[in-house]
Design a protein with these regions (language model features):
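Catalytic cores of nucleic-acid endonucleases
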Residues: 183-242
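Structural motif
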Residues: 175-176, 235
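Amphipathic alpha-helical segments that form well-ordered structural scaffolds
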Residues: 121, 125-129, 177, 224, ...
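Active-site metal-binding core of divalent-cation-utilizing nuclease and nuclease-like domains
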Residues: 147-174, 180, 184-190, 214-215
Length: 255
């Protein structure tokens, strides 16, 4: 039998104890992860190919069949599949913030998946990798591994008065819809009335338990993703960095 000696500290000793800082939530966690990814991107940036935003984030470019934001083997597979390579063309929401330095500089349009912080690029690096479908991953995701993998697809759901709404899904594998999050602050806010139009809304959700603030319905993307999956009799999941406990809490709050 093992005995543990009880230790009693006096008031002076307690004052000397280093108390760890509280875990930051929301934007603090997102900013910390964004800074880490930007630092890694800077270490890998190539002169004349990769660029910087005004916020010191790296925007990678392609050169000689390679791309700074993708593993070479994944990038080759993406370029070989038109249905995958189309995802690379989505224009970055910031387009281009930097101005050309001189008349001779060529200005390229920034794409969303060029950004070092792109969750979609990370998703494609994982699922476009050869022989990714190990037995463990198939079991984890509940797929056979032979399903078609689609990126940036539109999933339809029925609205009132016979209308149809489409939601962009980051990835679809068979009946599984996947939303990817990396450095995004949250799952966005949206008007409650927009999801109330879905014919399945009251069948799926207890509206009294959804959080509505002055900004609108919290975790709007999650609610729409679930409704899209329900409409196709499918499943819905979120992939995020394990340190994003704020996103995990949002998921649990909605589910």
């Amino acid at each position: 039998m093992t005995f543990t000696k009880q230790v009693v500290w006096d008031e002076v000793e307690m004052r000397e104890v280093d108390v760890p800082a509280p875990v930051r939530r929301g934007r603090g966690l997102a900013s910390s992860l964004r800074a880490e990814l930007s630092g890694r991107g800077l270490a890998r940036a190539r002169d004349g190919v990769d660029e910087m935003t005004r916020g010191s984030a790296v925007v990678f470019g392609s050169s000689e069949g390679t791309h700074g934001n993708f593993l070479e083997v994944c990038y080759r597979r993406i370029l070989a599949k038109p249905e995958w390579s189309r995802r690379l063309e989505k224009v970055h929401t910031a387009r281009r913030q930097a101005r050309p330095q001189g008349a001779a500089e060529q200005v390229r349009v920034w794409r969303e998946l060029d950004a070092a912080t792109s969750s979609d690029a990370l998703l494609m690096n994982v699922f476009c990798y050869p022989r990714v479908w190990t037995q463990g991953l198939r079991a984890l995701m509940g797929v056979s591994g032979g399903e078609r993998i689609e990126f940036g697809v539109r999933s339809a759901a029925s609205l009132e008065r016979g209308l149809v709404n489409t939601t962009e899904i980051d990835m679809r594998i068979g009946d599984l819809l996947v939303e990817a999050k990396l450095t995004e602050a949250d799952f966005q806010f949206g008007a409650l009335r927009l999801v109330e139009r879905y014919v399945d809304f009251d069948r799926v959700f207890d509206r009294e338990r959804l959080e509505v603030t002055r900004l609108g319905l919290r975790s709007y993307q999650l609610v729409r993703g679930v409704l899209a999956a329900y409409a196709m009799d499918g499943r819905f999941c979120v992939f995020c960095d394990g340190r994003r406990v704020d996103l995990i809490e949002d998921w649990l709050r909605v589910m």
